[in-house]
Amino acid sequence: MNTTHSTKSITLEPNQGIPPRLLFMMAAISGLTVANLYYNQPLLEDIRKDLHVNEVQANLITFVTQVGYALGLLFVVPLADMWSRRKIAATSMICAALMSVTIALTTQVQVLWAASLILGVCSVIPQMFVPMARLYSLPQNQSRNMGYVLSGLLSGVLGARVVSGYIGDWFGWRTMFFVASVIMLICLMVSLQMLPRMRPTYQGKFTGLMHSILTIYKEHPLIRLYSIRAAFAFGSMMCVWSCMAFHLAGSPFYAGSEAVGMLGLCGMAGAMAASGIGRFIPRFGIMRISFVGSLLQLCAWGVAWCFANSYLGIIATIILVDIGAQCHQLSNQSGCLAQTPRATNRSNTIFMFHLFVGGSLGTLCAGFAWNTLQWTGVCLAGLVFAVVSLGITLIIKK
């Protein structure tokens, strides 16, 4: 394979390896793009006050963003099997930049909801890169390279909270979304220069492509199992972050967006663990890694309830719930992609669609739980999601 400085001119072939510079670019852009979903989380209290809405309405901002991402997974990501990834990525980044500017300028929560929904749809680029890392890597490097790209993605998830917390506290929440639009334009220029040619793996019409996704879902029960199990684990993690700004705004913390953002650094443990987890999957198997992930999340919610008024308790909760979620995501996602090696984007679509439906439900349930029982309600909601995920593992044993 040509591994010179230019990667735009090469053509990737399955199982033949990915140039290191391209792999780094995929990880970096994955993180910067997926960050669009999470900038709003530390800023919810600031947005709520600025737009004069209640906590449930503010929580819906995160919810519709997650729903948009799920829709993008279902209708945009599969196109990577039949169209140019470079063109899909470019269109998505331009749209994401426009929606970020719209969010920064609006004074109506309804417009913010709509723009957040579309922003979620346009932020699915990482989910074209993760299966790409598996499909084109050398067989012995597939799990490792997937973990590398996921580490970049997860660093973006957690780094987004840190950056938005600081920018929101110092310059206001609207500034964060202007910055996000600039980041997307930079990613656009880089991706147009570096993304290589890749031959389509599907020949046919879009309707046939969508039907093939349904066929894969019907014919592969393990894909259904892995997807649903990971979805509940992700929902459990989203319960933490969807209400963190509200929890820290009250007694005894009285903290602003900067403090919420700083807690994002604690979740970096999950991002750092992702690459290592990928190495253990072939050795210990998907079920064992998932089991460990569920146990970590159960412990996390016990800590969250017992030490609700302690920063140390909150930090421990974030670390445990994030690492638990990454155990589930990487192991179950790897299992899904292994079921259909020639249709990785479509099987990844199924997996990630479930994941973000689970995340959306976790966000929604946590929002209503907060409105009813405050932090105790959030802990109960997160615990239920973790218990369901563990129950699936114990019953199915795969």
Give, region by region, the residue ranges found by the protein language model:
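Helix-loop-helix hairpin linking two adjacent transmembrane segments in secondary transporters
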Residues: 148-195
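Helix-breaking motifs and short loop linkers at transmembrane-helix boundaries and internal kinks
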Residues: 52, 84, 105-110, 307-308
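Helix-to-loop junctions at the C-terminal end of transmembrane segments
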Residues: 73-84, 273-286, 370
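Juxtamembrane intracellular "pre-TM" segments in multi-pass secondary transporters
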Residues: 7-17, 195-228
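Conserved MFS/SLC helix-loop-helix module at the cytosolic interface between two early adjacent transmembrane helices
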Residues: 71-107
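Cytoplasmic helix-loop-helix junction between adjacent transmembrane helices
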Residues: 115-151
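Intracellular juxtamembrane helix-capping segments at the cytosolic ends
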Residues: 125-137, 327-340
